[in-house]
Amino acid sequence: MFGYVIPDRASLSPEAQSRYRSAYCGLCRRIDALHGLRGRFSLSYDLTFLNILLCSLYEGETPADSGISRCPVHPVHGVLWRSADPTDYCADLSVALHYYNAQDKWQDDHNLLALGYSTLLDNSTAEAALRWPRQCNAIRACLAKLTEYEAAGSTDLDAVSGCFGALMAELFDYRQDRWAPELRSIGFHLGKFIYLLDAYDDLSRDKRRGAYNPLRELSTHPDYEEEMLDIFELLLARCAQNFERLPCVEDVDLLRNILYSGVWLKYNCKNAKRTGKPDAS
């Protein structure tokens, strides 16, 4: 359910692409510093977006760091990285999200790889939970609730997607300060979008396997594609509306690129395959 909140690289300037890569590498570097090499597997585009958003919103309020370093992925030529306090926050959340998700897969499917990975992240997640108990409790509770919905075969899209939305709202609410309403709304609506887009993307496969998918019933409607597009547009409009209320200056064009264009890339790619038309994005 990760990897949907991505930049539209084709529409980014070289400078913006460099800014994105440095934030991505900065998050990876802080995950490694806090949780070791095993934690690097939890690196995601979605938490990179949150890292960039929070670093922009709280620019100047916390010390920022940057540099050029080698790493296991780039052992020869050093790469530019940058980080600040919100980066450490996102590093902890990255590990916690993948830990609880792996535990969920083990409990649901007895996936041995998931069990092994969650075991590797046991200590790291315990440390993250001590620093961010509210957020980690929300991850655990919301994933458990999602399991209940899935076991019941729920087709209540608002309730099921809202569960993941509630999880993301807690993660976006970094400080519970004056910007909490806007951040929570961005997280909530983006979380619903991610959940439903993931279900939309997996629908054909889930039907073949007889697996749960909340869109199974809606997909029988003759205007299913139009309904889904309306839902996605509404959710992202709410995200954008609340984002524009934030006083972000640093990387604002990069953030807009992700929210207004990047998040649509996988949807557009899916529809290009379905219709046989070239992806215009």
Question: Which ranges hold each PLM region?
Answer:
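Acidic catalytic motifs of isoprenoid enzymes
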Residues: 1-185, 192, 196-233, 241-251, ...
